[in-house]
């Protein structure tokens, strides 16, 4: 089975690229989806997050207040590392399970949609690495306008990830997403042909 890593900095359009690949029939293993699942009410990771960051990160319905957690976890490298130490081992375990299941089911290509693929050195375990690239100012603009995040928060999150240059060095294929959605779709036709 061909393992393809898909990554890009926050706001790069990586999820849009994953959706385009999924619509072409590729299996997507989504690290963000797994990250959401492991912190659902009743999951051990949620209790550990409450212990680490306080009960105020829980909504009245018992679910995780993601913005509340982000406000505490992305204040500095130490707090980000604490968040990662709780969530990343569980994400890795579930990811490995899904890859094994895909291979057992005869899947030919599995794409791992992982924001921190290069940050965590997981690019080395992939057969091919796709990096979605967008300049920082465009990423900030998109996240402020489309997700309603504050500019300061966005820049903190960007700064908590590896620099774009490091991510680009790990790329086998760079997907330029500085243009429109139509431009991205045109770029993706070439990428899909390579896969």
UniProtKB/Swiss-Prot annotation:
It catalyses: 3'-dephospho-CoA + ATP = ADP + CoA + H(+). It is an enzyme of class 2 (transferase). GO terms for biological process: coenzyme A biosynthetic process. The keyword Metal-binding does not apply. Residues 3-195 form the DPCK domain. Keywords: ATP-binding, Coenzyme A biosynthesis, Cytoplasm, Kinase, Nucleotide-binding, Plasmid, Transferase. Belongs to the CoaE family. This is Dephospho-CoA kinase. It comes from Corynebacterium glutamicum (Brevibacterium saccharolyticum). The gene is coaE.
């Amino acid at each position: 089975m061909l393992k393809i890593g898909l990554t890009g900095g926050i706001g790069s359009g990586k999820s849009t690229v994953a959706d385009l690949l999924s619509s072409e029939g590729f299996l997507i293993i989504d690290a963000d989806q797994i990250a959401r699942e492991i912190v659902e009410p009743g999951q051990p990771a949620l209790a550990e997050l409450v212990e680490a960051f306080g009960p105020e990160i829980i909504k009245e319905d018992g679910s995780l207040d993601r913005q509340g957690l982000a406000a505490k976890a992305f204040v500095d490298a130490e707090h980000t590392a604490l968040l990662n130490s709780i969530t990343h081992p569980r994400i890795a375990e579930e990811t490995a399970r899904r890859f094994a299941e895909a291979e057992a089911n005869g899947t030919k290509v599995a794409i791992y949609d992982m924001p921190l693929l290069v940050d965590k050195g997981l690019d080395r375990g992939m057969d091919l690495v796709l990096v979605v690239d967008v300049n920082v100012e465009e990423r900030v603009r998109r996240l402020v306008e489309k997700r309603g995040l504050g500019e300061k928060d966005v820049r903190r999150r960007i700064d908590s990830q590896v620099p774009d240059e490091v991510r680009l060095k790990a790329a086998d294929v760079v997907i330029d997403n500085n243009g429109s959605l139509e431009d991205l779709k045109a770029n993706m036709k070439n990428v899909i042909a390579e896969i």
